[in-house]
């Protein structure tokens, strides 16, 4: 419900794309410059950057920003037009993106599916630079055949474009002797414009090639380039870096490691360590800046390098030189993270081989058959022979076979290839034939085979066996296995395959040369010793592994899910426009191993296993063949005019989330941007996705509005209040508000965040500042490259506003921007969100604007009162009451500071502080508590202040306790207990967590503070382990129910059907309860991380695991059946207490007698926090002896952090996103502290400090009776209204109004006007606010007031206020 207004709804500094000045929200949303650059809005849309440049040139205001973009756009469009002429069709989205990067002179790694035209683009771009720019290019290919093919393609392009003068030189091994001699002569003379060779030639002649200056080097065999340090140096030299530049790059790598170490030391507890780290960090930063500037200057004179994606994971310092010198890291295959496979299994009635033959004959050509690795090449050969005898054209393929077999298979001359299911084998990893491979058959479950002697001590092999022993019920074995796993996993992350193989060979020979060797040897010896124990073998039989006897020896068969996913993935490949459908069939030869495979695969991917016999095979094969036909048409270029692949930028908030999403789709390529940002690039089929992080908020309200801001806002504002302009609308009293935003700066030294336009930290003076403007520039850079932009910030009002700010910043560079909403970070959720983007929700944005502006206004209005009026009063009280000797937390501060600026007040903060104060004061008051105890069990308790208990009862108890103190004789009572009712009842499970209940239990059960719990939950969400954690919904989605069912089936087997009770809990809305996203419990999660199956972008600590376990158990409990509980109701009568009678209810049993399987225990099987109590008496009634205990106790106990959050939810103030922040602020301001419980167990109590009590009393009581003589009559009258500003009722009402804005039932300007009316008099009279049109009103009301003069003189010394206060607008 936007108000009609003459001015902008918002102003953003630095976002004019032309001059870099402030720009309005409305102009940004249209992609236009600020009013100074473009005074008159164009009637029609502006066509691109070149059209905008022409428009600004006519105005005489063309600036550097638009001029540079127009030049880049024209360069890219020239390449697009040339490409269309050369190829016969316009470039697709990916090719347009690559052209834009080339126009900028960037180097990058290509991640793209089959059929997108990588090589075609490389050839066309090379010809463009040769023909139109007179610049050389070099194309490097993996094979002679491809080199010859590209040469033919270039010759055709030359003819199409009329570039007959371009000199093309092709050198490969199939040239005749005379042709090669002539080619080499031309090469030596430099008689070429485009050079095409293999990678081997590039390595051999790198020094000679470095003498030619290339504009483009296109490498279609990056694996060959990354194979060795020599290969890396060769390509860097060819691109244009000499030995000196390479050495500088290596020095940068060393300094970056040192910088990371020093940043870690800034967190030290010792000041001298931090100070030394600061000095060294500045020195390292300066050296890095110098070296990076020198490299940047050199980079401007080098070729653009384009490389294809890598199949492996390259490691080593030389590989990292690409990042330093060329700003990118080569990614892996962009399609291994995606699969579209029908996963099935079948049990053979005869033999495995016979079943394989039957399947292949039914499924036809285009098949891959995999035999288990323990069966070996010999079995693959025998199986291929059996297939041939059955009339199938089959061949076994392995390392000793010629590569031409793969070519014959690709051409259709061979129907089926048979190979070994080896993770590193060609048929498992290196085959990418989307038009040819239709299905895969596994002749036995993929597995590893281990004997008791272990065999080869390769670390990866040992890790697999350790992962099985880690599941052993023998705790000492499982614990030791997990310990060895952690060490080996760290080793596998940092060492190359060659280094790992060398370690294995040394250990096998009994040679130990270093720490890594020793770790492998220790793991090897542990495994041998463990497998020599009979009890270990017995425990293994309980797991989903195979135990077989062969030749008098026992072996373990361990399922190999990674190989299964890789091998079956050969049937489902990315191509330009989608992912091919594939079929996988496992012929089961060992049932336990198959169960283990199915279970382990589900931890790595979303797989729906089906019986092969239940498949609609005809329909599946028809779809498989239709997909292959699409691929063939794409490769032949028959989809001209149809854009099958587009590029998209996805912006999320955190780098962790960006990395997590990228890894769903394989090993991403990474580009480093000038502002320090990273962009991860992956392929999803119809999109090439570039993923970046905004780092959270990129803009916040300015502290002081200036003239340029007013110019951008337009209209005639009446006031500027703490970064917000107020406009009067007509004569009806309505108003409109324009927030003014600027970039956020963060000190890398002390962590302080500020918005001042300063190059030094206002708090500590450090020059180590990170400005969010650099993030904006990086985002704009990538947004210009993309066809479309998606903003995937968090799914709440704060995330909507962050996303809206980002969208406005990017709009001039990206016309197509949409919002993505996802509540869990999983591959499925991301793909669904990409398929269903939405527009931004203006109501959510407006609601967050209201929250931020209201928070700023209240804080900036009230906080100065605390700094400059409250503090001296408080200090006077402290010094008078405590003197010089009695300790007090603020005595030294009072002596040191006349004003104290680490104080604040807020609308939600103050009532919350009030609850803590009330409980703290009540805690100091004492009442008598009488406990009547039988056999250490509390029967009942009586408090002396309980109005429900008769006074006569209290008097008797009091007398007995006093008598005991005098005589030392313990008072005893006779209590008659009668069972009134005894019945079995259903005990319902708790609902899944919302934010408040999670914080309560994290505090109560784990001892975590609310801020820490939220930080841990944020990690778990961003790592893709739980759903969004800022929610007040208990709703469970269908997917959530499926997660519960799958885990219960794994955990309880056949009992799962009796235990599973799916519940929705809440209805409607997009939000969901907090739950795990996969059926993985905490023990399994820990193992999968240690195995490397799950890779997280951060360190999984014990606290992460404990909170995850709590969330996991609570959710599983919510989806389980009720517990059968035996409830007993007792009536207790105490004759000696005037016949006092009361009722006592207890749950004495959970789970019915005779239920050995525990089904009737229901949800308590996983939720251990519900326990039965002992029976009070046996039989129906009995007299029992009870002891009376009496002691003084607090009238009320203080809150715990969890209870404070629960109270905020119950009383309706605060929101899921602010609960923890409010509590954290109270601690940071030292208004509250945490104290241990008397019994020393459980979450600590939160008590108000002297400072907190006095702050609360000042705001709510003292100002209510402000003295007119001290403050002046007018000001005193206004100060008396302050208590109402921070009252709980007013806060709750404002929360209600903000909820109405969120739903679209109220206008943001109307709500802000109501807040302004509350604070305006105070702001004007104290000269805080900048009156624009009516300055005399403020001056007139405060002239001659001594209190105001002193107050302002004090307040302007605050770093926050000195740039806000003062007359007029700066």
Swiss-Prot record:
Name this polypeptide is given? Reverse gyrase 1
The UniProt record's further free-text remark is:
This enzyme is the only unique feature of hyperthermophilic bacteria/archaea known and seems to be essential for adaptation to life at high temperatures. It may play a role in stabilization of DNA at high temperatures.
Q: According to the UniProt entry, what is the EC number of this protein? A: 5.6.2.-
Q: Which residue range or ranges hold the Topo IA-type catalytic domain?
A: 841-1323
> Where does this protein hold Zn(2+) 2?
747, 750, 761, 764
Give the catalytic activity: ATP + H2O = ADP + phosphate + H(+)
Q: Which SMART domains match?
A: AAA, DEXDc, HELICc, TOP1Ac, TOP1Bc, TOPRIM
- Specify the signal sequence span: none
- Enumerate the active-site residues: 1028 (o-(5'-phospho-dna)-tyrosine intermediate)
Q: Which InterPro entries match?
A: AAA+_ATPase (IPR003593), DEAD/DEAH_box_helicase_dom (IPR011545), Helicase_ATP-bd (IPR014001), Helicase_C-like (IPR001650), P-loop_NTPase (IPR027417), Reverse_gyrase (IPR005736), Topo_IA_2 (IPR003601), Topo_IA_cen (IPR013497)
Gene Ontology CC: cytoplasm
RG N-terminal-type ZnF: 6-47
Which parts of the sequence are RG C-terminal-type zinc fingers? Answer: 744-772
Its predominant location is cytoplasm
List where the motif DEAD box lies: 220-223
Required co-factor(s) are:
Zn(2+); Mg(2+)
The entry's free-text remark on domains says:
Introduction of positive supercoils requires the cooperation of both domains. The helicase-like domain probably does not directly unwind DNA, but more likely acts by driving ATP-dependent conformational changes within the whole enzyme. A beta hairpin in the 'latch' region of the N-terminal domain plays a regulatory role in the enzyme, repressing topoisomerase activity in the absence of ATP and preventing the enzyme from acting as an ATP-independent relaxing enzyme; it also helps to coordinate nucleotide hydrolysis by the ATPase domain with the supercoiling activity of the topoisomerase domain.
What's the gene? rgy1
Domain Toprim span(s) in chain numbering:
647-825
The record describes the protein's role as: Modifies the topological state of DNA by introducing positive supercoils in an ATP-dependent process, increasing the linking number in steps of +1. Binds to single-stranded DNA, transiently cleaves and then rejoins the ends, introducing a positive supercoil in the process. The scissile phosphodiester is attacked by the catalytic tyrosine of the enzyme, resulting in the formation of a DNA-(5'-phosphotyrosyl)-enzyme intermediate. Probably involved in rewinding DNA strands in regions of the chromosome that have opened up to allow replication, transcription, DNA repair and/or for DNA protection.
Provide the species name. Aeropyrum pernix (strain ATCC 700893 / DSM 11879 / JCM 9820 / NBRC 100138 / K1)
Tell me which domain of life the UniProt entry assigns to the organism this sequence originates from: Archaea
What cystine linkages occur within this chain? Answer: none
Region (Topoisomerase I) residue spans: 643-1370
Q: Any idea which GO molecular function terms this record carries?
A: ATP binding; ATP hydrolysis activity; DNA binding; DNA topoisomerase type II (double strand cut, ATP-hydrolyzing) activity; reverse gyrase activity; zinc ion binding
């Amino acid at each position: 419900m936007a108000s009609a207004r003459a001015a902008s709804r918002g102003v953003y500094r630095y976002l004019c794309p032309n001059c870099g000045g402030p720009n309005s929200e409305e102009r940004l949303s249209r992609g236009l410059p600020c009013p100074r650059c473009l005074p008159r809005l164009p009637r029609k849309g502006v066509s691109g950057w070149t059209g905008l440049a022409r428009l600004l040139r006519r105005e005489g205001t063309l600036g550097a920003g638009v001029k540079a973009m127009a030049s880049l756009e024209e360069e890219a469009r020239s390449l697009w037009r040339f490409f269309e002429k050369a190829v016969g069709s316009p470039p697709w989205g990916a090719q347009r993106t690559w052209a834009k990067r080339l126009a900028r002179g960037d180097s990058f790694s290509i991640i793209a599916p089959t059929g997108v035209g990588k090589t075609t683009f490389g050839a066309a771009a090379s010809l463009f630079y040769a023909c139109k720019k007179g610049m050389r290019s070099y194309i490097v290919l993996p094979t002679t055949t491809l080199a010859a093919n590209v040469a033919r393609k270039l010759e055709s392009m030359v003819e199409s474009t009329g570039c007959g003068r371009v000199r093309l030189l092709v050198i490969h091994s199939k040239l005749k002797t005379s042709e090669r001699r002539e080619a080499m002569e031309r090469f030596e003379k430099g008689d070429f414009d485009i050079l095409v060779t293999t990678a081997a030639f590039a390595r051999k002649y790198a020094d000679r090639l470095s003498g030619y200056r290339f504009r483009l080097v296109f490498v279609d065999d990056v694996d060959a380039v990354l194979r060795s340090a020599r290969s890396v140096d060769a390509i860097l030299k060819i691109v244009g870096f000499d030995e000196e530049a390479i050495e500088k790059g290596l020095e940068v790598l060393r300094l970056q490691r040192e910088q990371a170490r020093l940043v870690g030391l800034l967190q030290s507890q010792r000041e001298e360590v931090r100070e030394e780290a600061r000095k060294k960090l500045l020195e390292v930063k300066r050296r890095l800046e110098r070296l990076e500037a020198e490299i940047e200057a050199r980079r401007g004179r080098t070729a653009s390098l384009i490389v294809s994606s890598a199949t492996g994971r390259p490691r080593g310092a030389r590989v990292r030189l690409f990042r330093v010198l060329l700003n990118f890291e080569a990614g892996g295959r962009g399609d291994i993270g995606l699969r579209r496979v029908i996963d099935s299994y079948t049990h053979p009635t005869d033999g495995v081989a016979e079943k394989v033959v039957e399947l292949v004959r039914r499924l036809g050509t285009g098949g891959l058959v995999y035999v288990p690795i323990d069966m070996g090449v010999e079995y693959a050969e025998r199986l291929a022979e059996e297939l041939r005898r059955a009339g199938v054209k089959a061949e076994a393929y392995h390392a000793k076979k010629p590569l031409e077999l793969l070519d014959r298979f690709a051409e259709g001359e061979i129907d089926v290839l048979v190979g070994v299911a080896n993770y590193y084998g060609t048929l498992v990893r290196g085959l990418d034939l989307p038009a040819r491979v239709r299905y895969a058959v596994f002749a036995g479950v993929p597995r590893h085979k281990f004997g008791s002697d272990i065999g080869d001590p390769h670390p990866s092999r040992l890790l697999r066996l350790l992962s099985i022993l880690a599941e052993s019920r023998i705790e000492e074995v499982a614990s030791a296995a997990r310990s060895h796993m952690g060490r080996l996993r760290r080793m596998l992350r940092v060492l190359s395959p060659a280094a790992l193989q060398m370690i294995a060979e040394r250990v096998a020979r009994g040679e130990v040369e270093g720490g890594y060797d020793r770790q492998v040897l220790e793991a090897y010896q542990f495994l041998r010793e463990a497998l020599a124990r009979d009890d270990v073998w017995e425990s293994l039989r309980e797991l989903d592994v195979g135990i077989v006897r062969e030749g008098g020896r026992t072996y373990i068969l361990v399922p190999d899910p990674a190989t299964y996913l890789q091998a079956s993935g050969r049937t489902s490949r990315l191509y330009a426009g989608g992912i091919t459908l594939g079929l996988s069939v496992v012929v089961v030869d060992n049932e336990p191993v198959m169960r283990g495979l199915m279970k382990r695969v589900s931890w790595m991917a979303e797989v729906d296993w089906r019986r092969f016999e239940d498949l609609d095979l005809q329909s599946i094969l028809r779809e498989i063949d239709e997909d292959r036909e699409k691929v063939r048409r794409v490769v032949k270029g028959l989809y001209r005019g149809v854009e099958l692949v587009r590029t998209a930028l996805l912006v999320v908030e955190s780098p962790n989330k960006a990395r997590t999403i990228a890894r769903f789709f394989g090993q991403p390529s990474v580009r480093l941007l000038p502002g320090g940002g990273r962009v991860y690039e992956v392929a999803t089929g119809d999109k090439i996705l570039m993923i970046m992080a905004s780092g959270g908020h990129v803009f916040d309200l300015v502290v002081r509005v200036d003239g340029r801001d007013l110019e951008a806002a337009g209209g005639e504002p009446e006031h500027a209040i703490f970064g917000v302009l107020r406009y009067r609308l007509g004569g009806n009293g309505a108003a409109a508000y324009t927030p003014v935003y600027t970039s956020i700066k963060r000190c890398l030294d002390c962590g302080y965040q500020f918005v001042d336009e300063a190059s030094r930290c206002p708090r500590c003076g450090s020059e180590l500042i990170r400005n969010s403007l650099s993030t904006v520039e990086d985002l704009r850079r990538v947004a210009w490259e993309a066809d479309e932009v998606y903003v995937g910030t968090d799914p709440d009002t704060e995330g909507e506003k962050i996303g809206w700010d980002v969208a406005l910043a990017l709009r001039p560079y990206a016309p197509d921007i949409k919002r993505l909403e996802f509540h869990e970070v999983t591959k499925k959720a991301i793909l669904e969100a990409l398929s269903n983007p939405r527009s931004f929700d203006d109501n959510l944005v407006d609601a967050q604007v209201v929250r931020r502006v209201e928070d700023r206004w209240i804080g900036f209005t009230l906080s100065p009162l605390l700094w400059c009026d409250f503090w001296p009063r408080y200090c006077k009280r402290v010094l008078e009451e405590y003197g010089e000797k009695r300790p007090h937390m603020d005595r030294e501060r009072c002596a040191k500071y006349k004003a104290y600026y680490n104080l604040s007040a807020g609308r939600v903060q103050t009532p919350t502080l009030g609850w803590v104060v009330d409980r703290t004061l009540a805690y100091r008051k004492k009442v008598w508590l009488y406990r009547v105890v039988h056999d250490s069990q509390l029967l009942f308790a009586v408090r002396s202040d309980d109005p429900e208990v008769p006074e006569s009862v209290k008097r008797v108890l009091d007398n007995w306790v006093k008598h005991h103190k005098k005589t030392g004789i313990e008072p005893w009572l006779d209590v008659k207990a009668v069972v009134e009712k005894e019945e079995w009842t259903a005990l319902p499970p708790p609902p899944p967590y919302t934010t408040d209940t999670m914080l309560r239990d994290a505090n109560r059960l784990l001892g975590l503070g609310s801020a820490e719990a939220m930080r841990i939950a944020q990690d778990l969400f961003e790592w893709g382990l739980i759903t969004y954690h800022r929610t007040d919904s208990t709703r469970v989605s269908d997917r959530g129910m499926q997660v519960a069912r799958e885990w219960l089936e794994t955990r309880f087997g056949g009992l799962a059907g009796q235990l599973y009770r799916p519940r929705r809990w809440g209805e409607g809305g997009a939000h969901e309860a907090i739950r795990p996203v996969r059926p993985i419990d905490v023990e399994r999660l820990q193992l999968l991380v240690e195995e490397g199956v799950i890779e997280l972008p951060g360190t999984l600590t014990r606290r992460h695991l404990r909170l995850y376990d709590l969330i996991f158990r609570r959710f599983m409990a919510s989806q389980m059946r009720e517990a059968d509980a035996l409830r007993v109701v007792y009536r207790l009568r105490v004759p000696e207490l005037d016949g006092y009678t009361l009722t006592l209810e207890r749950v004495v049993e959970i789970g019915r007698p005779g239920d050995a399987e525990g089904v009737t225990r229901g949800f308590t099987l996983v939720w251990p926090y519900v326990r039965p109590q002992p029976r009070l008496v046996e039989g129906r009634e009995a007299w029992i002896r009870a002891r009376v205990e009496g002691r003084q106790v607090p009238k009320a106990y203080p809150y715990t952090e969890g209870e404070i959050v629960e109270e905020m939810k119950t009383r309706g103030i605060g929101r899921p996103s602010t609960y923890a922040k409010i509590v954290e602020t109270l601690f940071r301001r030292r208004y509250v502290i945490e104290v241990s419980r008397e019994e020393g167990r459980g979450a600590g109590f939160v008590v108000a400090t002297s400072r907190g009590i006095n702050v609360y009393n000042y705001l709510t009581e003292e100002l209510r009776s402000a003295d007119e003589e001290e403050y002046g009559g007018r000001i005193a009258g206004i100060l008396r209204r302050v208590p109402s500003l921070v009252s709980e009722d007013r806060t709750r009402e404002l929360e209600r109004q903000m909820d109405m804005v969120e739903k679209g039932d109220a206008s943001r300007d109307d709500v802000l006007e109501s807040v302004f009316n509350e604070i305006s008099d105070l702001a004007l009279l104290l000269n805080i606010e900048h009156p624009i049109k009516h300055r005399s009103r403020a001056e007139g009301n405060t002239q001659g007031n001594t209190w105001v003069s002193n107050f302002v003189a004090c307040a302007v010394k605050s770093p926050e206020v000195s740039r806000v206060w003062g007359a007029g607008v700066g």
